[in-house]
């Protein structure tokens, strides 16, 4: 009711205008300071204040002519009231409260404003402004020391590769130290290895962490406390599922004793030791909480010495301890708020928004208790929320029905295939499977296990090896179109987007793509993280993994990160592929054309071989190993400071990735590689190579002796090792422990002297008498036949052909697949494709050429040519003879080119000339005028118009253009708005048809809102008919129905009314569908039947009622009085 209140001090005349809801104690404090100041200046007597301690309040309204006067005096809880009881409320003693009744006064009686300037300025300095304390809270660590049966837990401050904490953490020092921080959870297994420095005589200790501890930002500033300081206590709340920041109220400080400890008045609890006290004046840390009295009535902090930065922190940097960490530590300690601030710019057209983890909307939707959120712990923390869902649609549709039919009809084939079936199944796409796999990233990181001197030796050996194989300086790929061409356009755009990249880039110009690449690079350079999408991989998995609910997760990079990432890594990766087998990796190898044989021959004969496959490889990679890959890449990249910063920020994002999960939670991981980053295989391979060189350095095997004692090849997490037979076993025995020190889980017990027993990249080497050929297991080949993942019949045919290629080397299996293929092409819908000559025949000679890289000569393909000749003789009447010369009777005469036998071709085709038959013969009967042909045959041969463009069932382009322009003008919209309206019109017509008898309005939806548009401009401007106009939309409508069916069962109303039961024909169930020669027979029959059913018993009147023809006629009837009435005569009593 009242908008402002003016407080007036009757003793000083001072006033203060405030909101009526202002806390009265602040007002009371304001006037008390004014009175104190005047007393000290001897302008006011203390007795006057005692006699008249109260003030007055005038409540006023906007534009009102009256005010309400209220007297305010200090509350006396012992005052006896009119009712005979005391006032009470002793906790409010001396606080101003209303005394007596309020009195209405005129506005003219309200004292004029009189705020004292000097006091106002003083009031401005009472409280300081906003300050960002995230710089401090982001480096707060929680430390737990478990030694000698005792456990102590407190906090510390991360600073580079060091932690600043309390000395009393290590009353016992013979156990493990667990470190929880905003860049992960770590475990130091042996605290006696830690080097520590006490700071003066205070309770402050600096711990030097092991070298594999990722360095933290070094932005903190320290100084000694001062008497005038006000401080606040800052903490990080390490919950099991997330981390949040905490800030206390401010407190004054006071030195105790000789100043090594200071007292503060902030409430604390056990375990709060080590938390920093930060000055609100400048943000400097002045001490860390250390002591409390037994009754917790007083708290003390260890003060920072005056020379702390110069004497301690500056000397720490002199040790060059953090020199080898190349990732950007300033971008590590991000949180959900940072994700919201770093959302992709408008140029990327993101459609989803990241929201805070515990916003009001989150509480309403219950997202904070999502099925994954409940399971989070350790090194997986929830940071934000992003709308998402679990995709359970599988790319593997199910068992191949054609293969099942073949086995049912062929007992011999069934007896052969059944033992090889059932070994693979569809991966499980469930919540449990996702939780099981994603939680592999939650394991704490073990520190201090690595021998850093030996690791540097191994790293330098890898550098030397790169130089020896001729690895050259790499460039940053700044050609935007080159980046675009190397994208997988069938993949999704990202977690904050919808659809595939192909649709995203559709219609974009080169300049627009270039701007996208620049924007992505700028995001990387700025340290802005994109939100990656975590999903389950839909694939065929071995049966034991399916039964154990083990499904691999895929973490895909968003477009806003991916483009810039490819700028940084693509050139290095391309050169890395080219060096396969020259260097100890097979990334980029082609297993065909003797590729696998070359690979196997790289392993010395008679050595001891071992194949090792990493377990939980991606999730076990530590920041230390990934940082080593970054060091190696920067070593071979061109000198460009912008590119180096982009690359460093990229690998920071790869380690500390924000992942959007299916339950809507965005989690932050602190270890491991991402399977969907553009360099996963190369980076994983490099880390295995680094691990191998570290292990060899620990064995003290010099670089020069490596080739004579060990050979190895890596591909991602796959590793193949060959060691000389005398002492090689000792090398293999030591590898597992060395790999484990780096966090990698490998088993090196699968050993053999037979190369054909080795398994590498799921392939084995099969010796066929001449060479090694790569083979996958027969059960895996059969799974291609057993399971159908094709969306089109042509793709299924290609899959069976791929199975034939993979089966070469298993003669019986290949022959059985050929039998199935022969059966398959006789069944619908494959028979129609076969009839068009679109099914492939893969000959034995082609397979030999593919695997063995042998040249094909005429004698090899002679039997095939002979068989084809016999087949053609049985089908045609004409005999075609090979001649010395061939002549084109309808073309210009020219001497035949000499036939020269060409050498070194994959297939020699230059030995015989084949007669050509003209497409149109001039012997046919053609229309003529005065003896001259009226057709241009040369034009006719090339004239192949699109059927729909010349069909009279579709409006011409001119008619469609006129219709479009008139409808757009009638609706008064732009071309961009019209594009959306036509989407709605097409979908409405799919449901309601295009009958000329339509009237009224048509509707489309905008979210939950229904919008109506008049039909009149749509119909009256349609020439020749509305159905012929809508025929232009036929293909789009067909694709739209398919899209709807891919999401859920959908049958247009036109098909439902005809009781169409086959949902595979739903795409043809609309009345403006355009039939062409490409329409399948079954679909054509179904559409015509639906059309016939819709038109049954329909009558169309050629003429309506003619309103111009009159119906008047002259009445010539004559009546007499004896007639019955005016319309009836009477004849002897008979009515006529």
From Swiss-Prot:
Annotated site (Cleavage): 122-123, 365-366, 883-884
Catalytic activity: Hydrolyzes glutaminyl bonds, and activity is further restricted by preferences for the amino acids in P6 - P1' that vary with the species of potyvirus, e.g. Glu-Xaa-Xaa-Tyr-Xaa-Gln-|-(Ser or Gly) for the enzyme from tobacco etch virus. The natural substrate is the viral polyprotein, but other proteins and oligopeptides containing the appropriate consensus sequence are also cleaved; RNA(n) + a ribonucleoside 5'-triphosphate = RNA(n+1) + diphosphate
Residues the record marks as active site: 168, 203, 273
Pfam family name, one: Peptidase_C4
InterPro entries: DNA/RNA_pol_sf (IPR043502), Peptidase_S1_PA (IPR009003), Peptidase_S1_PA_chymotrypsin (IPR043504), Poty_coat (IPR001592), Potyv_NIa-pro_dom (IPR001730), Rev_trsase/Diguanyl_cyclase (IPR043128), RNA-dir_pol_C (IPR001205), RNA-dir_pol_PSvirus (IPR007094)
BP term (GO), one: proteolysis
Any one GO molecular function term: cysteine-type peptidase activity
UniProt keyword annotations, A-Z: Capsid protein, Host nucleus, Hydrolase, Nucleotide-binding, Nucleotidyltransferase, Protease, RNA-directed RNA polymerase, Thiol protease, Transferase, Viral RNA replication, Virion
GO cellular component: host cell nucleus; viral capsid
Entry-linked PROSITE patterns: POTYVIRUS_NIA_PRO, RDRP_SSRNA_POS
Limits of the RdRp catalytic domain: 607-731
Entry EC number(s): 3.4.22.44, 2.7.7.48
Domain Peptidase C4: 123-341
Protein family (similarity comment): Belongs to the potyviridae genome polyprotein family.
Official protein name in the record: Genome polyprotein
Species this chain originates from: Ornithogalum mosaic virus
Top-level taxonomy: Viruses, Riboviria, Orthornavirae, Pisuviricota, Stelpaviricetes
């Amino acid at each position: 009711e009242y908008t402002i209140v003016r407080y007036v001090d009757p003793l000083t005349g001072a006033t203060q205008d405030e909101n009526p809801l202002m806390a009265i104690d602040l007002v009371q404090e304001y006037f008390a300071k004014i009175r104190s100041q005047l007393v000290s200046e001897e302008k006011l007597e203390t007795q006057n204040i005692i006699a008249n301690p109260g003030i007055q309040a005038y409540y006023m309204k906007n534009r009102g002519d009256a005010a309400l006067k209220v007297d305010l005096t200090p509350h006396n809880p012992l005052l006896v009231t009119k009712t005979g009881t005391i006032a009470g409320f002793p906790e409010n003693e001396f606080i101003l409260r209303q005394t007596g009744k309020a009195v209405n006064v005129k506005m003219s009686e309200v004292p004029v404003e009189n705020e004292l300037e000097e006091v106002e300025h003083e009031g401005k300095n009472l409280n300081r402004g906003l300050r960002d304390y995230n710089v401090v809270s982001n480096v707060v660590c929680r430390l737990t020391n478990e030694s000698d049966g005792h456990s102590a837990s407190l906090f510390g401050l991360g600073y580079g590769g060091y932690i600043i904490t309390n000395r009393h953490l290590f009353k016992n020092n013979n156990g493990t130290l667990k470190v929880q921080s905003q860049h992960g959870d770590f475990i130091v297994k042996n605290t006696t290895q830690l080097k520590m420095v006490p700071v003066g005589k205070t309770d402050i200790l600096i711990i030097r962490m092991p070298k594999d501890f990722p360095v933290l930002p070094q932005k903190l500033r320290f100084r000694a406390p001062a008497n005038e300081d006000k401080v606040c206590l800052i903490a990080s709340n390490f919950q099991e599922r997330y981390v949040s920041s905490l800030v206390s109220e401010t407190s004054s400080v006071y030195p105790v004793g000789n100043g090594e400890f200071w007292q503060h008045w902030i409430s604390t609890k056990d375990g709060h030791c080590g938390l920093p006290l930060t000055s609100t004046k400048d943000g400097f840390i002045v001490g860390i909480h250390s002591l409390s009295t037994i009754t917790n009535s007083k708290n003390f902090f260890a003060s920072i010495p005056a020379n702390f930065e110069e004497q301690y922190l500056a000397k720490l940097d002199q040790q060059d301890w953090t020199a080898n960490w190349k990732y950007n530590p300033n971008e590590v300690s991000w949180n959900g708020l940072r994700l919201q601030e770093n959302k992709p710019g408008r140029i990327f057209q993101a459609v989803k928004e990241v929201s805070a983890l515990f916003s009001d909307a989150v509480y309403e939707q219950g997202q904070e208790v999502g099925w994954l959120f409940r399971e989070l712990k350790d090194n997986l923390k929830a940071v934000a929320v992003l709308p998402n869902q679990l995709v359970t649609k599988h790319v593997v549709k199910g068992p191949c029905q054609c293969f099942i039919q073949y086995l049912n009809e062929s007992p011999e084939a069934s007896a052969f295939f059944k033992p090889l079936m059932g070994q693979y199944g569809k991966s499980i796409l469930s919540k449990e499977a996702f939780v099981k796999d994603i939680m592999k990233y939650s394991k704490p990181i073990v520190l201090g296990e690595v021998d850093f001197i030996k690791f540097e030796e191994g790293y330098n050996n890898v550098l030397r090896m790169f130089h020896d194989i001729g690895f050259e300086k790499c460039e940053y790929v700044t050609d935007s179109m080159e980046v675009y061409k190397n994208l997988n356009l069938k993949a999704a755009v990202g977690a904050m987007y919808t659809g595939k990249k192909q649709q995203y880039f559709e219609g974009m110009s080169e300049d627009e793509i270039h701007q996208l690449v620049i924007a992505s690079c700028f995001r990387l350079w700025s340290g802005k993280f994109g939100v990656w999408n975590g999903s389950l991989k839909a694939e065929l998995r071995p049966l034991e993994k399916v039964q154990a609910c083990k499904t691999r997760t895929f973490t895909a990079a968003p477009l806003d990160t991916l483009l810039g990432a490819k700028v940084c890594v693509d050139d290095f990766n391309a050169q890395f592929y080219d060096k396969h087998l020259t260097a100890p990796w097979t990334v980029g190898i082609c297993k065909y054309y003797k590729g696998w044989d070359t690979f196997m021959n790289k392993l010395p004969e008679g050595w001891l071989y071992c194949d090792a496959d990493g377990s939980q490889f991606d999730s076990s990679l530590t920041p230390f190993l990934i940082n080593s890959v970054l060091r190696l890449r920067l070593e071979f990249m061109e000198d460009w400071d912008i590119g180096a910063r982009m690359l460093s920020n990229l690998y920071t994002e790869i380690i500390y990735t924000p992942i959007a999960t299916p339950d809507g939670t965005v989690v932050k991981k602190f270890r491991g590689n991402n399977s969907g980053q553009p360099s996963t295989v190369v980076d994983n391979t490099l880390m295995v190579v680094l691990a191998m060189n570290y292990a060899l350095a620990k064995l003290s095997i010099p670089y020069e002796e490596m080739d004579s004692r060990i050979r190895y090849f890596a591909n991602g997490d796959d590793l193949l090792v060959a060691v000389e037979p005398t002492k090689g076993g000792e090398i293999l025995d030591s590898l597992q422990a060395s790999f484990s020190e780096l966090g990698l889980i490998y088993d090196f017990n699968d050993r053999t002297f037979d190369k054909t027993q080795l398994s590498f990249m799921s392939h084995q080497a099969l010796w066929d008498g001449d060479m090694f050929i790569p083979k996958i297991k027969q059960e895996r080949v059969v799974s291609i036949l057993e399971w159908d993942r094709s969306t089109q019949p042509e793709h299924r045919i290609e899959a069976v052909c791929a199975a034939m290629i993979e089966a070469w080397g298993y003669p019986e299996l290949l022959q059985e697949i050929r039998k199935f293929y022969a059966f398959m092409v006789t069944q619908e819908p494959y028979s129609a494709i076969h009839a068009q000559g679109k099914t492939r025949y893969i000959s034995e000679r082609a397979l030999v050429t593919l695997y063995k890289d042998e040249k094909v000569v005429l004698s090899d393909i002679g039997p095939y040519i002979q068989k084809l000749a016999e087949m053609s003789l049985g089908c045609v009447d004409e005999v075609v003879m090979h001649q010395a010369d061939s002549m084109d009777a309808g073309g210009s005469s020219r001497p035949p080119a000499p036939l020269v036998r060409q050498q070194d071709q994959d297939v020699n085709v230059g030995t015989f000339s084949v007669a050509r038959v003209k497409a149109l013969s001039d012997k046919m009967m053609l229309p003529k005028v005065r003896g001259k042909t009226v057709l241009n045959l040369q034009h006719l041969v090339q004239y192949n118009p699109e059927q729909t463009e010349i069909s009279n069932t579709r409006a011409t382009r001119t008619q469609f253009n006129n219709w479009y322009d008139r409808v757009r003008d009638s609706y008064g919209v732009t071309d961009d708005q019209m594009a959306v309206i036509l989407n709605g019109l097409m979908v409405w017509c799919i449901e309601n048809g295009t009958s000329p008898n339509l009237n009224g309005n048509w509707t489309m939806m905008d979210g939950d809102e229904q919008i109506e548009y008049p039909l009149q401009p749509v119909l009256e401007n349609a020439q020749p008919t509305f159905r012929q106009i809508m025929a232009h939309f036929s293909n789009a409508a067909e694709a739209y129905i398919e899209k709807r069916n891919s999401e859920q069962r959908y049958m247009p109303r036109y098909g439902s009314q005809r009781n169409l039961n086959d949902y595979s024909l739903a795409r043809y169930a609309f009345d403006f569908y355009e039939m062409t020669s490409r329409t399948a027979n079954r679909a054509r029959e179904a559409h015509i039947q639906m059309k016939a059913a819709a038109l049954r018993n329909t009558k169309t009147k050629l003429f309506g009622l003619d309103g111009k023809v009159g119906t008047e006629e002259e009445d010539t009837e004559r009546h007499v009085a004896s007639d019955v009435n005016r319309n009836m005569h009477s004849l002897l009593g008979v009515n006529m």
